[in-house]
Amino acid sequence: MLPAQHKLNSSMQFRTVMRKGRRAGSKTVVVHLWDSAESLDGTEKQGEVASFGGPRFGLVVSKAVGNAVVRHRTSRRLRHICASIVEKSPELLSPTHHVVIRALAGAGNAPSAELERDIRYGLGKTSRVRTNK
């Protein structure tokens, strides 16, 4: 599945990604992406969010998705998609990217191909560099 080095594992890490990151939504998921390399300005604690070992993922699957069986199945499918993105598409994310994927109510019934398409769309949209004109 998803190795420990690719997981967000504290509420502070989730909070940082959700508050400081960019987000893109679709019918089934909302993708929050935060690049720790461009956001660290010296005012934060160094240990707040680890930025080594590759991109890190966190999942939020609420009761809106369905009962416990549906939520756990959805979580397993999302973890598998994240692992395949890390393995097969390393150009999509840098090692300093931290991603939180929030499953919406439609994610429980959506096919895996649709979930993967929506996650890739969200990652592509949030990882684009913004330019000020």
UniProtKB/Swiss-Prot annotation:
Short name of one Pfam family for this protein? Ribonuclease_P
Which GO biological process annotations does it have?
A: tRNA 5'-leader removal
GO cellular component, as recorded: ribonuclease P complex
What is the reaction catalyzed?
Endonucleolytic cleavage of RNA, removing 5'-extranucleotides from tRNA precursor
EC number of the protein? 3.1.26.5
Enumerate the InterPro entries for this protein: Ribosomal_Su5_D2-typ_SF, Ribsml_uS5_D2-typ_fold_subgr, RNase_P
Q: Which keywords annotate this record?
A: Endonuclease, Hydrolase, Nuclease, RNA-binding, tRNA processing
> What is the recorded function of this protein according to its Swiss-Prot or TrEMBL entry?
RNaseP catalyzes the removal of the 5'-leader sequence from pre-tRNA to produce the mature 5'-terminus. It can also cleave other RNA substrates such as 4.5S RNA. The protein component plays an auxiliary but essential role in vivo by binding to the 5'-leader sequence and broadening the substrate specificity of the ribozyme.
Q: What is this protein called?
A: Ribonuclease P protein component
Query: Native species of this protein?
Result: Corynebacterium glutamicum (strain R)
